[in-house]
Amino acid sequence: MPILLFLIDTSASMNQRTYLGTTYLDIAKGAVEIFMKLRARDPASRGDRYMLVTFDDPPYGVKAGWKENHATFMSELKNLQASGLTTLGHALRAAFDLLNLNRLVSGIDNYGQGRNPFFLEPSVIITITDGNKLTHSSGVAEELHLPLNSPLPGSELTKEPFRWDQRLFALVLRLPGVAVPDSEQLGSVPTDESAITQMCEVTGGRSYCVRTQRMLNQCLESLVQKVLSGVVIHFEKTGPDPPVIGEDGLVDPARPLTSFSPQPWHSCHKLIYVRPNPKTGVPVGHWPISESFWPDQNSPTLPPRSAHPVVRFSCVDCEPMVIDKLPFDKYELEPSPLTQYILERKSPHMCWQVFVNCSGKHSDVAHPFGYLKASTTLTCVNLFVMPYNYPVLLPLLDDLFKVHKLKPNLKWRQSFEMYLKSMPPYYLLPLKKALRMMGAPNLISDNMDCGLSYSVISYLKKLSQQAKIESDRLIVSVGKKPPPETGIKVKNHSNALSLAHRRDFKQLLQGITGEVPLRLIDMNFKEFAGFQIALLNKDLKPQAYRNAYDIPRRNLLDQVTRMRSNLLRTTQKLIRGQDDDSLHSIPVGQMGNYQEYLKMMPSPLREIDPDQPKRLHTFGNPFKQDKKGMMIDEADEFVTGPQNKKRGNTGDLNSGTALKRRRSMSPLLRRPQTPPIITNHVLGKGPTGTQGQQGIIKPIPLHKGAEGNNVGGTESNGERVAGTDAGDCWPGEVDGESGEPAPVEDREDAAAPDGEEEILALENCLDDRSPDHTQNCEELSPPGQEGEMEVNEGDTPAQGTIVMIPLEGSNAELRTRVIKEVRKPGRNYEAIFRLLEEVKGPVSVQRYFIHHAIKEAARFKKRMLIQQLETALEEIEDRQMLPAQINNIHSR
């Protein structure tokens, strides 16, 4: 699983423009996206892990680490801003520490136990910078320095901050600000001369000097090919040069054996490829590379190791040794001057032995652990890793199987014991596994120690626990934003004299030149300790409608016009003026989010019945209703007694235990309302006035009948008994002359035999209107008194029918608030009557509001609220009819 870490320069110099019109930071962001697209072509890229680190101060520089997903990585990449310093050293250290978080916990480094090339986390660090001077809080640095103090436990066990499976590459942007003639030459991109180049070469990478967009694309394609699984090893020649071989394959004695000048192939810092197993996807190996020290059981600590092992090779030709069933590891070398030199010799049947200095028991002795050999086809050079001091072990094992037939004698055992003593103890475990594979599992006893002291083992365990804690802490801190700066500190230098105007200038000059002892300069320039310049907050936008001083001078006239239109609402726009600007000030990352904007837009088509709740699509029957959507306000409306499940039970309709059907919420049983016609003129103006009728609606206590039942017959489910004709829509109204409730017995036609007919009758009286009424209008007045029910519909007085126009302004808002209050659960109806008192307009408007509230209360079965609203409606009717009765008396 390769790790691809992008280290992006976020210093202020990355804001410079190129000839393309984009900034360096924009080019860096685009380069990351292009690299990811190129990398996605490889099927092996499925296991890639991407990380993002910037030049911000730690720990805020880590934008995407071990736990962040691809979406977080892309979001943080798009939100990068260039506003800091070029702290390349600290950023590199933070990147290496991030990669080394889990190494002690997982045991990849295997300190003191040999270096296993097949234990690796291949990582590629790609730095994109402008190559300018390195700056930090104290000044400008000429050289690149990485901090030595690392918060990561166990960092002292390695001399360098990086590891042998981590390589650093740098894309140094040198794009000019003005377009130049296309004079670039085809070929490899040259390395840059900045300070990061040397650091790249130390880790096994390189830098690229990018001058055009075409060169950048070429570099990215090259980097994609560099993502390989392997470790970096430093190969060095030891001993004399090999004899020169002529064209005929024989040694040429005329040429000297040793060259006095160093050749490029004498020292190479290159990668060896560690191929993963095609079946498991994980590299498999058997033998480690030797440590550069002999592990001593009496040593309390481990000496620090170098990141890249120094493997020395001898140029003495030897024949490769191998026996049957003995495992060995084979690693291909990256093309280098060393591989080129070996292949040019054209000797695929000869090898050069490799070893590590100070790996033996005695510091001056080093035994080979493998050899370098060209492939048979002379296409590559391979490193074969064998058991330690394999020239001694392989003949012993060959005799064991071929001569002794797995029954060694005393002499063979003594030779084998001497070999084990000269071998580093960390080779015992892999050797025992190899012997078990070969069929000799009992040659090495189980009580042999690995070679590390108890103090070293306990120290490594303690480091592993500390590394786990530090890893969790760093993972939690990833993504945190740095605290905003309160301001810029300002020093007052206006009252201070220049050094050239000081009286002791000559003495200061002599101190600098060394003529007299240097005297410290008084640097107290009367600094204001608490004086700061406030920083501009980019997130805060000027509120032109709140503070007139935020309006630029050139926009004053335009702003006054917009404020006037916003105040007077001269336009028909639904968007207010202060919201109009914010719609066009959206971040680039949110411009494509159309779904959230569409959710706030009103529906282009109105609902068939806006008062009905939305149907919930349930599994199975699409007409099935969700019972949770039924709101029952009154506790006494529930059927408290035991339900009778027998069929054909026809009990008393008014009994509390009788079962009734629930009212269907389906809009199929109701007739759709005709939308009102929007007009700009006002109808219904009369002598009643508009303001004189306020404050007359009050909640009135519920009247009780003689038998304790509520006025008007009610069923067990709380629904009111509705008549079948239009005159009997509201059977619960109070007689206008006597003030007594109408008895239930006088209304035989009000009680329908079925609950569903009652519901339909109630809905018809609320929704249906007579054909004599004005088209697209509603009848607002309730049915007349008992004496008026015999009057024909054609002879109805003019004031019995009221035509209502659509509500505008405050009344429209009041209607919405009244509906919301009616729908709220509970028995406190004071808020409803308080809102009805605020209705402005004639009596017809107040009737309309009360009728609408009664209709909504009937949907939610609020019987008590309906009766109180009916009582309030009767009071309005009485007060309206009182002047007419007085006029009749005077006319007599």
From Swiss-Prot:
Molecular function GO labels: protein-macromolecule adaptor activity
Chain ranges passing through the membrane: none
Location in the cell: Nucleus; Chromosome
Any one annotated GO CC term: INTAC complex
Residue stretches in coiled coil: none
Region described as Disordered: 665-692, 711-754, 771-793
Main location, first listed in the record: nucleus
Motif (Inhibitory loop): 630-637
Chain ranges of the VWFA domain: 3-227
Signal peptide positions on this chain: none
Keywords: Chromosome, Nucleus
InterPro entries: INT_SG_DDX_CT_C (IPR029307), Integrator_subunit6 (IPR051113), VWF_A (IPR002035), vWFA_dom_sf (IPR036465)
Family matches, as PROSITE patterns: VWFA
Functional summary from the UniProt entry: Component of the integrator complex, a multiprotein complex that terminates RNA polymerase II (Pol II) transcription in the promoter-proximal region of genes.
Record's subunit section: Component of the Integrator complex, composed of core subunits INTS1, INTS2, INTS3, INTS4, INTS5, INTS6, INTS7, INTS8, INTS9/RC74, INTS10, INTS11/CPSF3L, INTS12, INTS13, INTS14 and INTS15. The core complex associates with protein phosphatase 2A subunits PPP2CA and PPP2R1A, to form the Integrator-PP2A (INTAC) complex.
Domain note: The inhibitory loop acts as a regulator of protein phosphatase 2A (PP2A) activity: Asp-633 and Glu-634 residues mimic phosphoserine and phosphothreonine residues and bind to the PP2A catalytic subunit PPP2CA active site to block substrate-binding.
Family: Belongs to the Integrator subunit 6 family.
Annotated protein name in UniProt: Integrator complex subunit 6
Source organism of this protein record: Danio rerio
Source lineage: Eukaryota, Metazoa, Chordata, Craniata, Vertebrata
